[in-house]
Design a protein with these regions (language model features):
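Core alpha/beta nucleotide-donor-binding catalytic domains of modification enzymes
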Residues: 2-116, 126-134, 138-140, 145
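Aromatic-acidic/polar surface patches that form glycan- and anion
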Residues: 9, 30, 102, 136, ...
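Short alpha-helical patches at coil-to-helix transitions and adjacent helical residues
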Residues: 13, 140, 175, 338-346
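Short, solvent-exposed loop/turn segments at secondary-structure junctions
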Residues: 14, 35, 81-83, 127-129, ...
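Class I S-adenosyl-L-methionine
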Residues: 65-70, 85-263
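C-terminal target-recognition/interaction regions appended to catalytic cores
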Residues: 226-360
Length: 360
């Protein structure tokens, strides 16, 4: 069976597409604004036509439309930045209409959709994306409303929030999934699975302290400052060092660092990993510290954030992934934090062609 050709907009580094080779979809062209991310995408997918440019510009849209037509692309994958209005106020009709639609990048995808004949369209983002309001026809609407107004005659429009932890991924990471597919075609939702606790996912890897490395690729610990390491050594699994009475996070001058209850916090072994954000390399950010294990001296091991290997595993990224040689730890963590876990993308896309009844 021939593969469905697809184009990808707002593709970033292509993390979300890493497992699409296991599906019936082949991404033939992609667009990304930022050169470093576009270069990483080209590194991962040398056979895909990556166009680095601004999708709000006519020339970029025209390039992607031409590429879609050239390759006979029948699918669009779009992961636009989450931009919109979170509230409208009481007098929605009186709100000034944004004349510059470039502030709402998802609307730029409409020009591509209108000029191509896609069978399937996948739009994914953070859950709040479904609650945002966007300017349309001199008013403001949620995206699902706009899609129905514009495309209901041609497409079935469905939207759900799926959490990666329910689909074979050891990470609690909710993502908004919007599917459009032509009337007469089929596209089921993926079937939920048992949660995977962190122990089962990364518990086999050797313990590491701040700055230590191993002979396992990507399994090396970031260097953290001694004050924070000391505080976390005295912080049990699942707890935050912020709550410690003696060994709490301190500034250089010794004063206590104030923070939320989920900062400087260790994860739980018996639960999926918390969401990996773009700040997963910082112990001071939310829920980022390795669970650790109780040591004979009463302290806890692994006073550090997850290694890149551990981050790959809980993000469903292949352990043998080959990032460009000049990729920094921060860059890798950032593009992972921006992306849908690739296994969740795969699970959604592999249901193309299946009827809804099969997965109920």
């Amino acid at each position: 069976m021939s593969k469905i050709k697809a184009i990808s907009l707002f593709s970033s580094a292509g993390i979300g597409e890493l497992l699409l080779n296991n599906t019936n979809v082949d991404v033939v062209a992609a667009n990304e604004l930022l050169p470093k991310r576009a270069d990483c995408y080209k590194h991962f997918y040398p056979n895909t036509d990556m166009h680095c440019g601004d999708i709000t510009l006519d020339e970029t849209k025209e390039y992607m439309i031409a590429s879609a037509k050239k390759h006979g692309a029948k699918m669009l994958i779009a992961t636009p930045p989450c931009q919109g209005l979170s509230t409208l106020g009481k007098n929605k009709k009186q709100i000034h209409y944004e004349k510059d639609k470039r502030n709402y990048l998802i609307l730029s995808a409409f020009d591509v959709i209108d000029n191509c004949d896609f069978d399937y369209i996948l739009i994914e983002n953070v859950p709040t994306f479904l609650d945002m309001y966007f300017p349309y026809e001199d008013d403001y609407f949620k995206l699902e409303e706009i899609l129905n107004k514009r495309y209901a005659d041609k497409y079935v429009v469905e939207a759900r929030v799926l959490n990666a932890k329910d689909y074979g991924i050891c990470q609690s990471r909710p993502r908004a999934i919007i599917k459009l597919y032509k009337h007469g075609l089929k596209w089921a939702w993926p079937v939920s699975e048992e949660e995977i606790p962190l122990q089962d996912a990364i518990g086999h890897l050797p313990s590491l302290e701040s700055g230590e490395s191993s002979d396992i690729p990507w399994h090396f610990a970031k260097v953290h400052n001694d004050r924070t390491v000391l505080a976390l050594k005295h912080t049990p699994t699942g707890k935050s060092a912020i709550a410690n009475e003696v060994y709490y996070p301190k500034k250089e001058d010794g004063t206590r660092i104030k923070g939320f209850h989920n900062t400087f916090k260790r994860m739980q072994w018996d639960q999926p990993c918390p969401t990996r954000t773009t700040f997963s390399g910082s112990m001071s950010s939310h829920n980022n510290v390795h669970p650790g294990r109780l040591l004979p001296d009463g302290t806890y091991s692994d006073a550090r954030v997850l290694t890149l290997l551990e981050t790959f595993i809980v993000s469903s990224i292949p352990e043998n992934v080959d990032f460009p040689k000049d990729s920094t730890d921060t860059f890798i963590r950032t593009v992972i934090g921006e992306s849908i876990p690739p296994k969740l993308m795969m699970k959604v896309i592999e249901k193309i062609g299946e009827s809804v009844q099969l997965c109920q």
